[in-house]
């Protein structure tokens, strides 16, 4: 069984959460289904008549990103989401969102976009496709699971890969606690929902 079914009984409003396959009595209740796992895509991008890149009006639009050197781009890819199977977490999800579509559109996709925006200032655009490419993935995954990093900004000199000239840029750095763990500006919302 690839779905979780939430059944809300009439009159009492009591909810049951069916996470395992098998026969269950619905008793005229209203059911809502969620996939146990879901792949969230953000891979669509197109060009305008003027030749500019855009994601406007597309299904599954790529997320914009701005790097420390003010380079701009889009992040394309996907994230696998796995729903919790505990009643407490499923109850929160159902009460706050009420459907899989709202969960994806109002919690998951906006938070993926927020995390990608937060990753940009941690590196230059060239670093994002070279030596820090894997860091970008690790930063995004960690922030999705645990919350947005607290950062400080420092002026650093970097050699421009195209002009070979030294440039001063504002680059964000992660703030760490005394145990060497990243400090967080906010707790990740996925922690609350399991």
Spans of features found by a protein language model:
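Hydrophobic membrane-anchoring helix/hairpin
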Residues: 1-115, 188-192
């Amino acid at each position: 069984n690839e779905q979780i079914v939430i059944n809300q009984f009439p009159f009492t409003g009591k909810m049951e959460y069916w996470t395992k396959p098998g026969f269950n009595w619905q008793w005229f209740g209203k059911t809502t289904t969620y996939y146990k796992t879901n792949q969230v895509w953000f891979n669509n991008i197109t060009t305008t008549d003027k030749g500019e890149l855009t994601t406007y009006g597309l299904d599954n639009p790529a997320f914009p990103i701005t790097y420390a050197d003010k380079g701009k781009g889009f992040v394309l890819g996907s994230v696998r989401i796995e729903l919790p199977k505990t009643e407490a977490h499923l109850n929160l999800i159902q009460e706050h969102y009420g459907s899989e579509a709202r969960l994806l559109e109002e919690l998951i996709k906006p938070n993926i976009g927020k995390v990608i925006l937060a990753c940009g200032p941690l590196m230059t655009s060239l670093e994002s496709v070279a030596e820090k490419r894997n860091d970008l993935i690790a930063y995004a995954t960690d922030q999705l699971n645990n919350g947005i990093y607290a950062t400080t900004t420092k002026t650093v000199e970097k050699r421009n890969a195209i002009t070979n000239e030294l440039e001063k840029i504002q680059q964000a750095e992660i703030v760490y606690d005394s145990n060497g763990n990243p400090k967080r500006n906010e707790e990740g919302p996925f922690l609350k929902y399991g």
